[in-house]
């Protein structure tokens, strides 16, 4: 639980950058994968109040923390794994995940689930910033290559990757769209 608080505080800048890359708009249905204590959801609601937010996280402790922060605002929180939870097909306009991708049990399966859950033309944004002892720009670039490969394997198009120097380490945000047809 303490790790969730620490990551949340360090993720504020990453959250804003990822939200900018995602381009949320009024009326969007958005899924956050790995919502932690709910700070990114809170930031999205500050930016655009008329969105429909859902979140999925494996941690019961994070679900309880996030519920106190965003539940009164009509956010739906789910305890579960992106790889196995039966998300509705073609339901979300946008999917966002910040510093969560590398802790999924199966990234390829998680990306395929995101693809299935997105509406045609929907967009996903996944950001990672290595925090391990061996964190380096090379590791960040490796994460980026893996995200691109997973997006391609799932059938996404318009895949883009951006890098940004945010302390303590170089960060990567990969975005991709589900084909409109």
From Swiss-Prot:
Q: What is its EC number?
A: 2.1.1.-
An example GO biological process term is:
methylation
Arranged from A to Z, the UniProt key words for this protein are: Methyltransferase, Transferase
Q: Which residues form a coiled coil?
A: none
The UniProt GO MF terms for this protein read: methyltransferase activity
Q: Name one Pfam family in it.
A: Methyltransf_25
Main EC class of this protein?
transferase
Which domain of life does the UniProt lineage start with? Answer: Bacteria
Q: Which InterPro entries did the record assign?
A: Methyltransf_25, SAM-dependent_MTases_sf
Keyword NAD assigned to the entry: answer is: no
Claim: Magnesium is one of the keywords in the record: no
Member of which family? Belongs to the methyltransferase superfamily.
The name under which this protein is listed is: Uncharacterized methyltransferase YdaC
**Coding gene?**
ydaC
């Amino acid at each position: 639980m303490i790790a969730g608080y620490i990551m949340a505080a360090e993720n504020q800048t990453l959250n804003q950058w990822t939200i900018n890359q995602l381009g949320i708009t009024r009326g969007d249905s958005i899924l956050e994968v790995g919502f932690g204590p709910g700070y990114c959801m809170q930031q999205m609601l500050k930016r655009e109040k008329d969105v429909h937010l859902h979140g999925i996280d494996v941690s019961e402790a994070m679900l309880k923390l996030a519920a106190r922060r965003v539940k009164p605002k009509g956010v739906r929180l789910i305890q579960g794994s992106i790889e196995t939870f039966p998300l509705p097909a073609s339901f979300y306009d946008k999917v966002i995940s910040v510093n969560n991708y590398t802790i999924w049990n199966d990234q390829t399966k998680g990306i395929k689930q995101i693809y299935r859950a997105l509406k045609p033309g929907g967009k996903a944004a996944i950001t990672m910033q290595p925090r391990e002892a061996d964190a380096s720009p090379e590791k960040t670039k490796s994460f980026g290559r893996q995200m691109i490969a997973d997006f391609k394997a799932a059938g996404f198009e318009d895949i883009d990757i951006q890098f940004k120097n945010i302390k303590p380490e170089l960060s990567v945000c990969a975005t991709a769209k589900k084909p409109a047809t």
